[in-house]
């Protein structure tokens, strides 16, 4: 495995063979793929200043998870979507589980540490997703010791 990430988004361990991925439609995120461009992990984080939180809304993981779920719900390629609770490195997380009409799976974990909400997403096939999500939940931290820069 190799450790990837940034001080802004945190760090996770991913398989050594995974490579940096650039999605032309999104900027400012960290993404890696197994080379297929089908299995992709995305790391992001937002501060209160960066989040588009409406008056009366609280800036926290639950609110950001609701925003993420709403954004997904606006897409026309969703077969099924549901939420659940989880943990990332011992921190309570909101998990958004998605099955796309193509059969591809998507899973987003939203959690808060200090004054930031972190968003870890995975899109891909079921076999890769199951292993990846478990590993991601166990290895995420703000500790970049041993991280590679690519």
Indicate where each model-derived feature is located.
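Extracellular/lumenal ectodomain signal focusing on beta-strand-rich modules
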Residues: 16-17, 82, 95, 138-139
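N-terminal "mature-domain start" segment
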Residues: 1-27
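A general boundary/transition motif marking the beginning of the first structured unit of a protein
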Residues: 6, 55-60, 124, 128
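Extracytoplasmic/secreted envelope proteins and their assembly/folding machinery
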Residues: 12-15, 61-69, 108, 130-137
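Structured segments of extracytoplasmic/periplasmic soluble domains
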Residues: 21, 67-75, 135, 139, ...
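Surface-exposed amphipathic alpha-helical segments
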Residues: 18, 116-150
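Conserved polar/disulfide-associated segments of primarily extracytoplasmic proteins
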Residues: 24-118
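Residue-level detector of conserved, well-ordered beta-strand and adjacent loop positions
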Residues: 5, 97, 121-123
